[in-house]
Amino acid sequence: MNIRPLHDRVIIKREEVETRSAGGIVLTGSAATKSTRAKVLAVGKGRILENGTVQPLDVKVGDIVIFNDGYGVKSEKIDGEEVLIISENDILAIVE
């Protein structure tokens, strides 16, 4: 992937969601919800603080994160893959 996010932006790829229920029923439409887990593909250099210093991000490439899938999440196709560009503020947790 040939893209570098700026500042506190993070590029993530959403994890695939199981499309079958525990009972084996295939889920479609609104029943098949999108995952809010994703793998971090790239990170910016950090948030620029009021005093001009750069605060590094807490997430790093390869982390699995849980994110807020709402306003401010930008979807793009890069190298044929759908990725999301989000602010680090939209990341709720790192899965360890």
From Swiss-Prot:
One of its GO terms (molecular function) is unfolded protein binding. The keyword Cytoplasm applies. One of its GO terms (cellular component) is cytoplasm. GO terms for biological process: chaperone cofactor-dependent protein refolding. CDD domains: cpn10. Keywords: Chaperone, Cytoplasm, Stress response. It is found in: Cytoplasm. Its main location: cytoplasm. The keyword Phosphoprotein does not apply. Heptamer of 7 subunits arranged in a ring. Interacts with the chaperonin GroEL. Together with the chaperonin GroEL, plays an essential role in assisting protein folding. The GroEL-GroES system forms a nano-cage that allows encapsulation of the non-native substrate proteins and provides a physical environment optimized to promote and accelerate protein folding. GroES binds to the apical surface of the GroEL ring, thereby capping the opening of the GroEL channel. Belongs to the GroES chaperonin family. PANTHER family: 10 KDA HEAT SHOCK PROTEIN, CO-CHAPERONIN GROES. This is Co-chaperonin GroES.
